[in-house]
Amino acid sequence: MKLSSLKYIAVALMLGGAITSCSDFLDRPNEDSYNDGNYYQNDTQTKMSVVSLYTSPWFDFLCRGYYKIPEIMSGNLYKGQDPFLNFTVNGSDEAVIQTSNSLWNVNAQANTIYNRLKSAKASESVKRTAMGECLTWKAMAYFYLVRIWGDVPIVHDNSSEIAAGDYNNKYKVKAADVYEYIVMTLEKAIELLPESNDPGRIDRWGAKALLAKVYLAKSGINCNGNGQRDESDLAKAAELSKDVIDNSGKELMYNYEDIFKGENNNCEESLIGWRWSAEQTNYTCGNSLSAELAPSGFNEYQSWGDWTAPSVDLQDAFGVSPLDNPKSRTSNDTRRKATMMMAGDTYDYWWTDKGGFDYLKFLYDKTYAPGSNNGLQSATGANIAKHIYGDDADHVKAFGISAGASQYSSLSTHVLRLADVYLIYAEAKIGNQGSTTDASAIDAYFAVRHRAIKNINRDEFTEITLDQVLKERRLELAFEGDYWFDLVRMSYYDIEKAMNIIKNQRRNGYYGLPDLYKAYYNDGQPNGPWTVDETKMRYETDTPKPNVTKSIFKLPFPKGDVVYNPHLMEEAQHVDVRETFAY
C-alpha cells in the first residue's frame, strides 16, 4: 500500500478477468486496457468484469499471509523458527508486505470496477449484481485489513483521491469506524445482490453471512480489551445468521471431507470463495496452496510443504497425538483426517489412478512415491490435508484440465462457509453470558458437530458454552484462515484470555518421530510394532515459549508504507463514515 507510487495495474478483464499484482492502495486498473467505449457493452461483458475479484488480486495474500497470519500465529500451524510463530515479525517481512499489497489491490480493483459499472450498457439486474459483488469483495478486503492492522486508512474512491493528490497524506481511521464502513458497504451490497447467482459467485445470502460475521467481531471493538460486547451488534449477528440458516435454502454437506474435493468446488456450503483456475495463462489466477502446503512429491509438480505442519496444539484439540498407535487411535471426529494426515491414514480420493493415497507408504516407499522427501520431515508427525488436490490425474478428473507445470490448481478456497454461519449464530446467542440453553443456538452448534461426529445425539446437549463454540470453530475451520481472527476479536473484549490461550499452547515439535514412523512401516505396518521410547520420542520443551504481549494482536505496517506516509505511525482519526462516504 505504498502511497507514493501511482503506477497502474494491467487488467485483462476481457480475457477472463486476470490482474497482475500491485503494491499501492491507491493503484487503479490501467485505463488503456479497456474503457467505457469498448467494454461494459452488454450483460456478458458486465458479468465478466467482476470475475477478476474472485482470483488475481487475492493471490499475493494467498501465497503467504493467508496461512502464516491466521494459522501460524494462532498456533494451528508449526513452522520451525518462523517469525509468525514466535511473534517477532516486522515490517520488512515479505508476507506482511504481500498481504498489505494484495488487500489494497482488492480494494482498488473493487472501487474502480464498481464505478465503471454505473454506466454499463447492461440490464439493470446484471449491473446491480456485479456492483453488489464488487462491494462484498471490498468489504472482505477491509475485514481482513482491520483485523490484521486495526486502525487503517479508508480509500473510498481511488481515482478521485489520486486526482486530489492526497496519496501521501492518508491518516488512519479508528478501527471502530472502519468496522462501520464495512457494515455500510455490505448493507449496500445486500441491497444490490439477488438471492441467487451463478454457481460460485456471491449472492445476497453470502453478503448477509459476511455481515453477520462482521457484526460479531465489531461487537467487541469498543471494549478496550476488557468489557461487555455490544448487545445490539450481537443481536444483528444473530438475526442475520439465522436468516441465512433458515431462509437461504443452503445446507451443510453431509460429509465434511467432501467440502474440499474438486468436484464440490462451488458447493452451496461455500458462500464466498476464491475461484481459481489452472487454465489461465496468468499464474495469479491459480491456487498456489497445494505447492505451499503439500509435502514434496505429493504431485508431479513442485510442492514444499514438508515442514509446514499441523501443530501439536491443534492435534491436542482434536484429541490425538503423534505418539498414538495408528491401530488404536480413538478420535472419531472426521474433521481430523480431512484436516491433517497422520501415521496410518489413507485417502481414497487422492491418487485415484494408483488405488488411493497411503501416508506412510508415501513417506517410505520410493517405488510408490519416487518424489517424496526420504521419510518424515514434519516435526509434529503430520502434514496438511486441506487445500491440496492429489496428483495430476486427480486434478484432471475433477476439473478436466491438468494442473500443469505452473504448479497451481483450480481448487477453490472457501473463504466463508455455511458452517461458520451456524457457529456465528450460536456464539451471538450466547453473547455476554458465557453459556446458553437456547434451543436454536444448541441446534446450530449441534448441526456442525454432528456432521463431524455421527454418533452423538441432540438430547445430550442442554447447554452450550462460549468456550465450546470457540473450540468448535477452531476444529471446523482449521487451516481456513480463521482461528487467529477469533483470537483477535476476543482480544477486543477479553485480551487477557486471548493472551492466556496462546501462552498455554504447545507450539513446538517432537523429538524422535522419524525413527518411530520408519520402524513401524519397515517392520510391517499396519501390523508392525509401535514402540514408543519416551526418552527419545517426546515433545520438545527446549525452545522457550514466545513472548506474548498485548501488541501481538496487530501486525506492523510494511516499512515502505511508513516511509512514504508517516501518518501511519500517528494516532488514528475518528471519521463519521456515513456522513463522509456514500454509495
PLM feature segments, named:
Residues 1-31:
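Bacterial Sec-dependent N-terminal signal peptides
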Residues 23-83, 156, 179, 187-188, ...:
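An aromatic- and glycine-enriched ligand-binding surface/loop that stacks and positions planar moieties
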Residues 42-59, 80-149, 169-180, 184-199, ...:
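Conserved, well-structured interaction surfaces
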Residues 93, 103-106, 181, 259-314, ...:
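Long, intrinsically disordered, low-complexity segments
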Residues 146-148, 153, 197, 217-226, ...:
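Short coil/turn linking the two alpha-helices of tandem helical-hairpin repeats
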Residues 323-417, 582-583:
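Flexible, polar/acidic helix-loop-strand segments at domain edges
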